[in-house]
Swiss-Prot record:
This is tRNA-2-methylthio-N(6)-dimethylallyladenosine synthase. Keywords: 4Fe-4S, Cytoplasm, Iron, Iron-sulfur, Metal-binding, S-adenosyl-L-methionine, Transferase, tRNA processing. Monomer. GO terms for molecular function: 4 iron, 4 sulfur cluster binding; metal ion binding; N6-isopentenyladenosine methylthiotransferase activity. It is an enzyme of class 2 (transferase). Its EC number is 2.8.4.3. Pfam families: Radical_SAM, TRAM, UPF0004. Residues 2-119 form the MTTase N-terminal domain. Binds 2 [4Fe-4S] clusters. One cluster is coordinated with 3 cysteines and an exchangeable S-adenosyl-L-methionine. Its cofactor is [4Fe-4S] cluster. It comes from Cupriavidus taiwanensis (strain DSM 17343 / BCRC 17206 / CCUG 44338 / CIP 107171 / LMG 19424 / R1). The keyword NAD does not apply. The gene is miaB.
Length: 450
C-alpha cells in the first residue's frame, strides 16, 4: 500500500488542511498516512508564513528531501500552505525536484496535480483562490476520536499591518450554512461529541442559507450546531475582537454546550500599538467583551495571542501589556517577537528596539503566563471537572485521559474496571475529581454517582 507523509507547520487551520490532504489522497489513490518519511511515496509540506524565516525553513527541509528523491525517483514531493501561496513557481525554480506546489484553496486538486506531473514530467503549480470550491470536492471526514475540527470559513479581510494571511489565504469566504451543519451532523453520527469550528476570523462567518438571500451569522450557526443530536461541546478558533457581537456574547448565557473557555487574541494592550497594527479596536473595547462574558460566566478562562517588540513599542507600552495579562489572568497564550513579513505595511516601519530587549520582554511575558497556568491548575485541585474521555492515557494505557473545558489534559485510573469497560467510556462526558496538578496535566478520580 502506498503511503503519504505530511509535515505541518503553523495554525490549526493548517492541521485541518493536512488531514484533508490525506483524506483526498486516500479517497482518490488509496494512500495511507505514515509518520516515517522514508516509507512515503508522497511527501507533502504544509507550510506557514506567519513567522520569521518561514521560507528558508521550507527550503532547508526540501534540501534534505533531494537525496531521498535521488534514491526514489518516483517519489512525489509537494509544497502546500501559505509559503506556497507566497512563493509559487519560484519554489520549483529553487528546488526543481519539487513536483507540485499548491495553495490552501487548491488542496482538493492534489490528485489531479500529481497525475499531471506524472503524465507530463513537468512540475505543477496551482496557487489560485477558487473561493470556497475546495469544500465541494473533499471526501467525508474520517473520524478519529470524539473530537473533530470543522472549517466554516476561509481567509481574512482585516489586513492587520503585520499579517500575511489575507495575501496567502485570500479574503473572508464563508461556507454555506447547510453544508457546515451537514458536516457536523455526519461527524456526530460517527461518534464525535466535540467540534471545534475553524476560521482565520471564525466569528466573521456569514454563511448563505439555502437558496434564499438570508445570511446566517456566527451566533446563529452555533445555535444550530448545538441542536445537532450527539454534539455535547462546541469550541471555536480563532476569533477576532472586532467581530465579537453582542449576540455572540449573549449566547454564553443560554448555550451550555459552548465551552467555558475562549481564545480571543488581543495582540497588545497599548492603543497606540493597536492602531499601528490596524487591529480595529481599543483596549477598552476588548476589556468590555471580557467583562460582559465574565458577567455571564464568572469562571470563564481566557487565552490570547501577543506580539512583543512591535515597531515603536516602548517600556511603557509593554508595561500596559503586562498589566492587562495580570488583570485578565490569561490561561495560556501564543506569544512571539514581532517579525516583519515581506509585503506587509509593518515591514516598512522604523524599528529601533534592540533584539535583546525584545527577547527580555518575551521571556518576562511568558514567565508570567506560565505562573498563571500553574496557579489556575493548582486552583482546580479539589474541584470536580466535566471531562470528555478521549482514550488511553499516553504514559499508562491502562488509564484513561480526557480534557476539561479549559483544555487541561486529565489522566485518571479505573481500578478493577476491565478493558471493555474502559473502552465504553471513550467519547463520554464524565465527572472527575481533580487530585493533583502537574506542569502539563492534571490527575483525578472518576466520580461515581449513586
Amino acid at each position: 500500500m502506498k503511503k503519504v507523509f505530511v509535515k505541518t507547520y503553523g495554525c490549526q487551520m493548517n492541521e485541518y488542511d493536512s488531514d484533508k490532504m490525506v483524506d483526498v489522497l486516500n479517497a482518490s489513490q488509496g494512500l495511507e498516512a505514515t509518520d516515517n518519511v522514508e516509507d512515503a511515496d508522497v511527501i507533502l509540506f504544509n507550510t506557514c508564513s506567519v513567522r520569521e524565516k518561514a521560507q528558508e525553513k521550507v527550503f532547508s527541509e526540501l534540501g534534505r528531501m533531494k537525496a531521498l528523491k535521488a534514491v526514489k525517483p518516483d517519489l512525489v514531493i509537494g509544497v502546500g500552505g501559505c509559503v506556497a501561496s507566497q512563493e509559487g513557481a519560484s519554489i520549483v525554480s529553487r528546488a526543481p525536484y519539487v513536483d507540485v506546489v499548491f495553495g490552501p484553496q487548491t488542496l482538493h486538486r492534489l490528485p489531479d496535480l500529481i497525475a499531471r506531473r506524472q503524465r507530463t514530467g513537468q512540475s505543477q503549480v496551482d496557487i489560485s483562490f477558487p473561493e470556497i470550491e475546495k469544500f465541494d470536492h473533499l471526501p467525508p471526514a474520517r473520524v478519529e476520536g470524539p473530537s473533530a475540527f470543522v472549517s466554516i470559513m476561509e481567509g481574512c479581510s482585516k489586513y492587520c499591518s503585520y499579517c500575511v494571511v489575507p495575501y496567502t489565504r485570500g479574503e473572508e469566504v464563508s461556507r454555506p450554512f447547510e453544508d457546515v451543519l451537514a458536516e457536523v451532523a455526519g461527524l456526530a453520527e460517527q461518534g464525535v461529541r466535540e467540534v471545534t469550528l475553524l476560521g482565520q476570523n471564525v466569528n466573521a462567518y456569514r454563511g448563505k442559507m439555502g437558496d434564499t438571500s438570508e445570511i446566517a451569522d456566527f451566533a446563529l450557526l452555533i445555535e444550530y450546531v448545538a441542536e445537532i443530536p450527539g454534539i455535547e461541546r462546541i469550541r471555536y478558533t480563532t476569533s477576532h475582537p472586532k467581530e465579537f457581537t453582542s449576540r455572540l456574547v449573549e449566547l454564553y448565557g443560554r448555550c451550555d454546550k459552548l465551552v467555558n473557555h475562549l481564545h480571543l487574541p488581543v495582540q497588545h494592550a497599548s492603543d497606540r500599538i493597536l492602531m499601528a497594527m490596524k487591529r480595529g479596536y481599543s483596549v477598552l473595547e476588548y476589556k468590555s467583551i471580557i467583562r460582559r462574558l465574565r458577567a455571564l460566566r464568572p469562571d470563564m478562562s481566557m487565552s490570547s495571542d501577543f506580539i512583543v517588540g512591535f515597531p515603536g513599542e516602548t517600556d511603557a507600552d509593554f508595561d500596559k501589556l503586562m498589566a492587562m495579562i495580570e488583570e485578565i489572568g490569561y490561561d495560556t497564550s501564543f506569544s512571539f517577537i514581532f517579525s516583519p513579513r515581506p509585503g506587509t505595511p509593518a515591514a516598512n516601519l522604523h524599528d529601533d528596539t534592540p533584539r535583546e530587549v525584545k527577547l527580555q520582554r518575551l521571556q518576562r511575558l511568558q514567565a508570567t503566563i506560565e505562573e498563571n497556568v500553574q496557579r489556575i491548575s493548582q486552583g482546580m485541585v479539589g474541584t470536580v471537572q466535566r471531562i470528555l474521555v478521549e482514550g488511553p492515557a499516553r504514559k499508562d494505557p491502562t488509564e484513561l485521559h480526557g480534557r476539561t473545558e479549559n483544555n487541561r489534559v486529565v489522566n485518571f485510573a479505573l481500578p478493577g474496571v476491565p478493558q471493555a469497560g474502559r473502552d465504553r467510556l471513550v467519547g463520554q462526558l464524565v465527572d472527575v475529581s481533580i487530585t493533583q496538578a502537574f506542569p502539563h496535566s492534571l490527575r483525578g478520580e472518576i466520580v461515581v454517582r449513586q
